[in-house]
Amino acid sequence: MPEQSLPPTVFHMLEKNVGNQIRVILDASYGFEGTLAAVTREPAGIWLSDAEAVILRATIAQPIPQVASREERSEIFVHLNSVQRIEVIHGPSHR
């Protein structure tokens, strides 16, 4: 019988993206964008470097939320209990 591999956990998926630009959505209109610097298990969270707080807006004409404004931050720890969604940003920086 072939050995079955376990599916990757959230931590494995996050660890694969260390060093990449990500957007962390905390609620429908607020989140953070920055470079994923580290993943911790106790407490469960992520560290972002060169982070910015972002305000997201959606309209009837554009239902997918877009970044409406940004505010510079520095290093930020985000606990995974407060995260709704994490997006990996591919390509050139959106700053």
Indicate residue ranges for each PLM-predicted region:
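Conserved RNA-binding domains used in RNP assembly and mRNA/RNA metabolism
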Residues: P2-R95
